[in-house]
Amino acid sequence: MNIENSGVAVERPGRRVRRRTDGDVATCVRVLADVHRRDGYPVNWPDRPDAWLSQSCAWGAWVAELGGRVVGHVGLSRGGEGDLAPGVWSDRNGTNKDLTAVVSRLFVAPQARGHGIGALLIGRAVAEARGRGLHPVLDVVESDTAAAALYERLGWELMATVEQRWSPSQLVAVHCYAAAS
């Protein structure tokens, strides 16, 4: 991974991040399916993965390209009903949770890992959040140790681990992270 002294991944020839277009969604769904088969993300495969990708991206969605191919995705939005990190951040800081932006729907194709793509995507979402005057936060299931390791390498702080009921029979431990101030 190419990281500048500031700890921020930078674009290099052959890899870049750009705004997602409607034409990218089908490719993103295929990449997400590969990620799901390999890593189990998302934990519960959505009935409509195209809609799932878009529902948490109200403020923007970006794709990463490696060698001209879409290999990753990230979204940014205001916290929703199932997002725990905004409330945890708000409680810790004594501020309104509306001052947060949720980084979500982050994934990188298995064959594209090790090139700094995840860091580039997170960096783009963080820049957008900060440009809006908001603090970036995210939730990740406790079992996704690779994602947690990435966030921590990038300086994100684990605020809490909480139990979240996803269905009457599914209770999941979720880590709540906040970007460094």
Predicted regions and their residues:
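Conserved acetyl-CoA-binding loop-helix of GNAT-fold acetyltransferases
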Residues: 108, 114-127, 149-153
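Active-site rim helix/loop that mediates acceptor-substrate recognition in acyltransferases
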Residues: 37-70, 75
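Conserved active-site alpha-helix within GNAT-family acetyltransferase domains
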Residues: 119, 131, 143-160, 167-170
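Conserved GNAT acetyl-CoA-binding A-motif
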Residues: 129-141
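Conserved GNAT-family N-acetyltransferase fold
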Residues: 62, 72-74, 101, 106, ...
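Terminal substrate-recognition subdomain of acyl/acetyltransferases
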Residues: 2-10, 138, 157, 162-181
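A short beta-loop-alpha structural element at the N-terminal edge
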Residues: 14-30
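Conserved acyl-donor/pantetheine-binding loop and adjacent beta-alpha core of acyl/acetyltransferases
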Residues: 75-105, 165-170
